[in-house]
Amino acid sequence: MTAVTSTTDFDYEFDAAKGIQRNNLPPFAQRMRKAADLVWEEGYQQPFIRELGEGTLQRERFAFYLLQDFRYVNDYARVHALGLAKATDPEIMAFMLKVQNGALQVETEVHRSYLASYGITEEQMNNVRQSAFARAYTSNILSIAYGKDILDILVAVLPCAWVYADYGYRLAAEFADTLDNNPYKSWVDMYKTDEFWQDSVWLLDHIEKLVADASEERKRELIDIFVTGVENEYMFWASAYDMQYTWKPEWNQAR
């Protein structure tokens, strides 16, 4: 197996002629990625992601994740709907609409397919109890979508798009020899593609343009939004691995 690791150099000269690539990021994208690097790489090495790539992840853990993610995707779509309402640039409006529709149609179909094979009904999916970690994540991005401007919204939705594109790509390369027999192959297949990565490219490009005249204080605010999102991605998977609904496992006994 060939492991694909992230570059540790985030201070290189961006080659605009090549366009945005995984190893050719514009300056502000480099700053965001560098700021999140510790949690980003710990996220890729955490048990949920490793076992998913190996195909050894317990089905119960994956089902817990899928049910929580099913709820998350619906809120993610709402964030894009709010972004659509706030946007004045037709190109941004079109992107928000595209992602909203894709989240509700394409991604939820993968969830439904897996969950149906596990004997989980549509009613159970729609009535699943949201974990504290998932609720913290969605509450954060919804709060930004309601109370902030379009640039904040673009940065808030970037971690989900970028982390999934990166992890999917790296898992597909690292476990290429065994992926065909992996029960989670369709999950990896969905996120490994260049087509999925292009959503991140679009976001990175437009964020870069919108921060061009921003103050340093404003840029730091946006970096904080981004890093918080990457941290929430980490905890989303970690809590799914532990199948944990509450902040502390023992608190679940009172529910």
What is each residue range found by the language model?
Residues 1-22, 249-255:
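Eukaryotic N-terminal low-complexity, Ser/Thr- and Lys/Arg-rich leader segments
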Residues 64-75, 98-102, 221, 225-228, ...:
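A non-catalytic, amphipathic alpha-helix used as a structural packing/dimerization or gating element
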Residues 4, 223-255:
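Acidic, carboxylate-rich catalytic segments that either coordinate divalent cations
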Residues 37-42, 57-86, 106, 155-165:
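Alpha-helical bundle segments that constitute or directly flank the non-heme di-iron/ferroxidase center
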Residues 20, 91-198, 227, 231:
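Active-site-proximal alpha-helical scaffolds that flank and shape metal-associated catalytic sites
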Residues 6-14, 20, 33-57, 76, ...:
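Short alpha-helical hairpin
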Residues 19-20, 24-28, 32-33, 140-146, ...:
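Hydrophobic alpha-helical segments
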Residues 193-226:
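Long amphipathic all-alpha helical oligomerization modules
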